[in-house]
Amino acid sequence: MQERYDFKAIEAKWQKKWEELKLYEVDDFSEKPKYYCLEMFPYPSGKLHMGHVRNYSIGDVVARYKRMRGYAVLHPMGWDAFGLPAENAAIKHGNVHPADWTWDNIANMRRQLKELGISYDWRREIATCHPEYYRWTQWLFLQFYKKGLAYKKKAPVNWCPGCQTVLANEQVIDGECERCHSRVEKKELEQWFFKITAYAERLLQDIKKLTGWPEKVKIMQENWIGRSEGAEITFKIKGHEETISVFTTRPDTIFGVTYMVLAPEHPLVEKISRGTQYEKDVLEFKRKMMYLSEIERTAETAEKEGVFTGAYAINPFTGEEIPILLANYVLVEYGTGAVMGVPAHDQRDFLFAKKYNLPIKVVITPPGQELKAEELTEAYTGEGILVNSGEFTGLANKEAIRIITQEAEKRGFGKYRVNYRLRDWLISRQRYWGAPIPVLYCEKCGIVPVPEDQLPVVLPYNVEFRPTGESPLKYVPEFLNATCPECGGPATRETDTMDTFICSSWYYYRYTSPRDKQQPWSKEKVERWLPVDQYIGGVEHAILHLLYSRFFTKVLYDLGLVHVDEPFTNLLTQGMVLKDGAKMSKSKGNVVSPEEIVEKYGADTARLFILFAAPPERDLEWSDQGVEGSFRFLNRVWRLIYQTKDRISDELREFSAKDKELNRLLHATIKKVTEDIEERFNFNTAISAIMELVNGLYQYKEGEINPGLLKEALNKLVILLAPFAPHIAEELWEALGNKQSVHLEKWPEYDEEALITEEVEIVIQVNGKVKDRVMVPRNAAEDELKEIALNTPKIKELTADKKIIKVIIVPEKLINIVVAG
């Protein structure tokens, strides 16, 4: 063992050895209990950033710890490799192909991950852009299609003019594209969708099964699904055969409806306004709305805008004619795209009615009060009693919701309905670098799924990527033109590619059988490994990726392809890595490169700092001093073992008081580190406990030592350090004379007996006020305690010349001396 901690040589040596020993390759059918530890796989951008290092270091501690606890640990890594950045790089640089760019990036990031010493089973590596992977993505699309869960329809979609493609609702943040921040527009296009709404209720109800998930993630999913109960009521349109259905959570206010508003995209808009004097205004309003995002149209602060269509609806309960308007705040994707206006009892309706001089009619009043429409300064939205409501007048409004819904059902113009905010998942993308949708179009046969034995539908290599708003694949004749498998006639291929979130919705199954050419996964292996025991990733995936993965798993369960209906038992969402209080980004100029840190201090220091600086779920503030501190600590551990390794042996002498204190500290540390990893993932406090043990060992080695105890303490120290700093732990383990890898060692158990100290500190009070503290034998008799307390110098002085009335003793806690005078 060298005197100097040469991290470069040590880390290279052990990474090579681990690979030679196949140390982290797991046997699918080991007799050990299974543990599936998974970090969200990255997009291969080319370089790891500190967020990656944090994510993978957290996962690696868990994986290494569980191996040492006797589990067969599946800990794989792969690449979420399709997506716009590869295409954008090709466009930007002009001479690089997305495939080449992606594979080069994968090679670089794989090297970086190996240099960090993350304990992956690299045999299982997958990349979603490999035909052997997306073949099964396409196969899964066909299973969804057969089950009626994949369909094509013309729909107003979110169009990003910057990326020149369609976005799912979840990819629009505050009216902007989450990737390039362009303002998102609305466009009518034929698109493919997955019918996630068919699973809305199950996705919502099963949130309660997710006991190992953070509360905030569960709440975000609940809100996104957005369940509401109410009634669907059908209104006739004066002079037209068509009807308009509205969904309302407040059927108790039906008698207060004074107008109706439609979304500008509602299919009846043009028909009901045709030939009226308002037609031109209606078409202009509709055109204007196409350029506004949902946020711009529906925000609380947004100006409520509308236009009269010239048509009237008929209230089915009262027979009253009410004007039909278009309004910016009504969206065709939500409910039915039509809303009944009740200005007296809905604030948004109230503001709209005031602006356009529409009537206001009070139909609910607080008990014992009267409300006058002309005196209202805002809508009354509280509980109350129905007024001006025909035969329902006098009912409490909560009761009226049920009764009016039943009455509407009885009369044939309404029904109870559950509505969801969740929309179907739009999966078409007009870009090249994605999995082709395995569908053909035949003039004779219509939509024809590609036969399974013709998969994969491979992406052609020679393609022009410049975005035109249409898929680049449209301009590749050898891809586009095909033969219909049903009639043998000419057919064309679907040229849109799939949303990359489809690829990442099932990847955790493929890790169980990454090279299987016959099926997406072996059922036997999935039954062995799934569900994922611990999933780790950023909270920014709370809705998109996690909801889609839950949806996929439920569909696969229904198809009999998997045995679980929830994919992830436990979820840890780690915080961001900040510098100067802001998220690291090139634009802010505050990026710290992991490669530079590894070069200067080593991977173990980088890992240790990032695990020590904050609990995993909190944001972490980068600190150069903190990195220096972690490096100094590892050097301190190195010196400790360098200075003591020749003083240890198997000779275990009888314990002195000093030995007992070290033994107690050792077992207290084992207990603390074990509980912090096992129960709380508080790696920062676990590392802190290891640091205290190192301090204790430095004190212990001065003077007389017990060679057997010191050997045990040093060995256990190295084992405790191993999940956090795996390379230095291996080197120190070898220096201590051990033969097999430290990562194959059994995790140490702590002895409760050893934790018991022989002395305890007790408080001494005089008349209830703390005056002194003293160490006493743990099981001292009351007479002995009384004598110790009365003879301490401080208490002697305070009780001199005073009459002691009584001495109250609370064992192992306090002694209270009650005196007079």
From Swiss-Prot:
It is found in: Cytoplasm. A motif ('KMSKS' region) lies at residues 583-587. Its main location: cytoplasm. Its EC number is 6.1.1.4. One of its GO terms (molecular function) is ATP binding. PROSITE patterns: AA_TRNA_LIGASE_I (PS00178). It holds the Pfam family tRNA-synt_1_2. InterPro entries: aa-tRNA-synth_I_CS, Leu-tRNA-ligase, Leu_tRNA-synth_edit, M/V/L/I-tRNA-synth_anticd-bd, Methionyl/Leucyl_tRNA_Synth, Rossmann-like_a/b/a_fold, tRNAsynth_Ia_anticodon-bd, Val/Leu/Ile-tRNA-synth_edit. GO terms for cellular component: cytosol. One of its GO terms (biological process) is leucyl-tRNA aminoacylation. It catalyses: tRNA(Leu) + L-leucine + ATP = L-leucyl-tRNA(Leu) + AMP + diphosphate. Keywords: Aminoacyl-tRNA synthetase, ATP-binding, Cytoplasm, Ligase, Nucleotide-binding, Protein biosynthesis. A motif ('HIGH' region) lies at residues 42-52. ATP binds at residue 586. The keyword Oxidoreductase does not apply. Belongs to the class-I aminoacyl-tRNA synthetase family. NCBIfam families: leuS_bact. This is Leucine--tRNA ligase.
